[in-house]
């Protein structure tokens, strides 16, 4: 029979394992049921057969095709997708901002509702925790919203001081890190329990791409103008390392941990994808050149070896073999995919 101490240790280990699994799946979901793509340029959400790469259906998640979708989160049970409707522009130039989050049933591939976040505007980055609660950055309003999607209620509107564009949520949902792009030269740190901003991590040139490690110990932030990753220790919320992105001349768009937590993939405007060892960021990097440019989104196939990369500027998606760091093929997908995910 276990002692009380060993029972507690065993329970803690199970909890940590569960959090790690949730963290990987919630930030970089995967699955064999389907493939969803956010065709930002085309103003559509598109569904593809994950085996044949053939488009199955599409829908307009905003009021019309001009009010564009940008980001998405998949619910923990993989039954729903939540898509932010940003507006008719891009960061810094969004004259008619959106104010809704589309709710999509993944089984039927139909839009089943929306959440109106008014008076807040321009919802962009979105994350979901293990309970299903949503965290949404409304950049024009300088707020991160905490939303219960079951009721559509905005539980909190957290002032983050900057035009937060993308988010990283720790796997245990204890803290949230907000990339303020070029508006504020720091990352805003939010205590999720108190729903308050509790710190800043200086970013010399600003940052857009941001991702939390599956163990919750590290946040990676992409330098907005120079080819570096800033490594942040979440225990202290301080920068502890800086990684040069090999072969790059400019900043990084986005960062993704693979669902198994073994790899870090980073996307660059030039069309370059760099693959890093998540457990040794200083290990030699491997580079793949996609068949397009302005890379933003990555979807991880359930085989653990394949990733799809959205070529935002070309209206195509490229398939990458992660083991061999090679380009396998490319297929047409809307007019310009920003984010995508298997489910």
Labelled PLM ranges:
Residues 10-20:
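Bacterial N-terminal signal peptides
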Residues 1-11:
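Bacterial N-terminal signal peptides that target proteins for export
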